[in-house]
């Protein structure tokens, strides 16, 4: 978490390097936010974070697919989405969606880690391809 001044300072020195803002982690839900002292719900917090990123002229945003529609209204640049799963196994993630759901919600890029790397990588990639081609 960072304030506007820090974001602007990072952007100022970033040169050609793209600066990407990360909103609320997909491992958090509204209950988790309250536990760590936030008085806003996830949608409110993400909206606030995106407004800061926009003011700082960041190049992209990382957010859950659950908030992509909110982010798209506020931020017209690329959106990167973690928390992608093909099944109900969420591991430590609390807010997950399928690749198709993320695409339908408007995500530009998907971060898919454990669903590929856990187990047989080739088979897992094929499962993703099959899912996307349905």
Predicted regions, residues:
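Glycine-rich phosphate-binding active-site loops on the catalytic face of alpha/beta enzymes
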Residues: 1-6, 86, 95-99, 103-124
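Conserved, mostly hydrophobic/aromatic
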Residues: 53, 71, 102, 113, ...
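Short, electropositive alpha-helical surface patch
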Residues: 75-83, 125-134
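Short glycine-rich, acidic/polar surface loops and turns
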Residues: 67-71, 92-101
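Glycine-rich loops and low-complexity Gly/Arg-rich segments
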Residues: 43-48, 103-107, 134
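Generic secondary-structure boundary/loop-capping signal
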Residues: 22, 81, 93-94, 113
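Conserved anion-binding
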Residues: 1-69, 76, 80, 86-89
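Acidic (Asp/Glu)-rich catalytic clusters
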Residues: 11-15, 72-73, 99-106
């Amino acid at each position: 978490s960072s304030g506007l001044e820090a974001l602007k300072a990072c952007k100022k020195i970033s040169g050609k390097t793209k600066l990407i803002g990360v909103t609320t982690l997909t491992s958090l839900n509204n209950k988790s936010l309250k536990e760590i002292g936030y008085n806003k719900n996830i949608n409110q917090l993400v909206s606030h974070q995106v407004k800061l990123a926009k003011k700082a002229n960041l190049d992209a945003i990382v957010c859950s697919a659950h908030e992509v529609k909110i982010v798209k209204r506020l931020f017209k640049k690329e959106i990167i989405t973690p928390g992608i799963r093909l099944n109900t196994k969420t591991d430590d993630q609390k807010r997950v969606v399928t690749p198709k759901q993320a695409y339908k919600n408007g995500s530009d890029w998907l971060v898919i880690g454990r669903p590929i790397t856990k187990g047989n990588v080739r088979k897992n990639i094929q499962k993703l391809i099959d899912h996307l081609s349905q």
